[in-house]
Swiss-Prot record:
Membrane topology type: Multi-pass membrane protein
Sequence motif Selectivity filter, location on chain: 128-133
Pfam family, one: IRK_C
Known regulation of activity: Channel activity is strongly regulated by variations of cytosolic pH; channels are activated by alkaline and inhibited by acidic pH values. Activated by phosphatidylinositol 4,5 biphosphate (PtdIns(4,5)P2). Inhibited by Ba(2+) and Cs(+).
Record lineage: Eukaryota, Metazoa, Chordata, Craniata, Vertebrata
Record's protein name: ATP-sensitive inward rectifier potassium channel 10
Gene: Kcnj10
Disulfide bonds: 108-140
Transmembrane region(s): 62-88, 141-166
């Protein structure tokens, strides 16, 4: 038996200026390659009010540059706001020098005679610097109440800000960035069956506990009633060579989906790389060090699924007995024999009325015993 010549296929890295789509094909994907949503929400009533009602999530999801700008402005704003209040207290009590206080006058706040001095006293009190040059006296009970109110309110504000910063830093999203999916999916024979395969790797030494990979096939679907579902979701199951539901992701693993008669992919044009569907992959697991749930996502368009290829082995053994995962080979594939037992299907797109007419004519031809093939142009 003649062996199949192996030809290495180097993957192309996706960028915004060079997407992984063929020229002339409109880029349409629900999920980007790095797992971000590609959906734009429009015409949401009271959207800003809804975001303000959930301030915690809003601040955590906020980008760092806006978060730092907002919180810096918040601190400076509270210093200035309470500085103005302290200045008004000094005006009401007659502490300003231009008001001509008597020689034995005891001010509410010593050495606060201007708005600048009031601002500095507010800053020193809120940050607990306490230089000692400006201090509150026992003359004004209102000033004592104001100082307590400022410290309580600003302490709550600092707790909220510190909490959002820590929550944003500790999010498992950053851990998810060290989980890598292969740029392409491949279709080849595995254990005598045609399989769609993807490769996943953990680039940290700390493990993910209870890993599970699930898939969602997104495509336009027409019901028997003629209703068009724009993004119909169908589950696509993946497994490793073992029967375990929780693979040991210490080395790069290849996950398989058997494309048989029960597979939702059996009628898709996988060989041609054409069609109107998207395969979304989701890996879920628990971070070993923090026990937080981590989820990694990616998606594959038809042109990102390679027919008749398999992944190049990326695991080797060193002279010292250590296993080596070579990530320079992670995205490389090798040409193999085309998988057998899988028909090259085509998916029809176009006007639903034309598709209905095609189907009815085809059924009629089958009843009449005719081998006539019917196809209506979408022009």
């Amino acid at each position: 038996m003649t062996s199949v010549a192996k030809v290495y296929y180097s993957q192309t890295t996706q960028t915004e200026s060079r997407p992984l789509v063929a020229p002339g094909i409109r880029r349409r994907r629900v999920l980007t390659k790095d797992g971000r949503s590609n959906v734009r929400m429009e015409h949401i009533a009271d959207k800003r009010f809804l975001y303000l009602k959930d301030l915690w999530t809003t601040f955590i999801d906020m980008q760092w540059r806006y978060k730092l700008l907002l919180f810096s402005a918040t601190f400076a704003g509270t210093w200035f706001l309470f500085g103005v209040v302290w200045y008004l207290v000094a005006v009401a009590h007659g502490d300003l020098l231009e008001l001509g206080p008597p020689a034995n006058h005891t001010p509410c706040v010593v050495q606060v005679h201007t708005l600048t001095g009031a601002f500095l006293f507010s800053l020193e009190s809120q940050t607990t610097i306490g230089y000692g040059f400006r201090y509150i006296s026992e003359e004004c009970p209102l000033a004592i109440v104001l100082l307590i109110a400022q410290l309580v309110l600003t302490t709550i504000l600092e707790i909220f800000i510190t909490g959002t910063f820590l929550a944003k830093i500790a999010r498992p999203k950053k851990r998810a960035e060290t989980i890598r999916f292969s740029q392409h999916a491949v279709v080849a024979s595995h254990n005598g069956k045609p399989c769609l395969m993807i490769r996943v790797a953990n680039m940290r030494k700390s493990l993910l506990i209870g890993c599970q990979v699930t898939g969602k096939l997104l495509q336009t679907h027409q019901t028997k009633e003629g209703e068009n579902i724009r993004l119909n979701q169908v589950n696509v199951t993946f497994q490793v060579d073992t029967a375990s539901d929780s693979p040991f992701l210490i080395l790069p693993l290849t996950f398989y989906h058997v494309v048989d008669e029960t597979s939702p992919l059996k009628d898709l044009p996988l060989r041609s790389g054409e069609g109107d569907f998207e395969l979304v992959l989701i890996l879920s697991g628990t971070v070993e060090s923090t026990s937080a749930t981590c989820q990694v996502r990616t998606s594959y368009l038809p042109e990102e699924i390679l027919w008749g290829y398999e992944f190049t082995p990326a695991i080797s053994l060193s002279a010292s007995g250590k296993y080596i995962a070579d990530f320079s080979l992670f995205d490389q594939v090798v040409k193999v024999a085309s998988p057998s037992g899988l028909r090259d299907s085509t998916v029809r797109y176009g006007d639903p009325e034309k598709l209905k007419l095609e189907e009815s004519l085809r059924e009629q031809a089958e009843k009449e015993g005719s081998a006539l093939s019917v196809r209506i142009s979408n022009v």
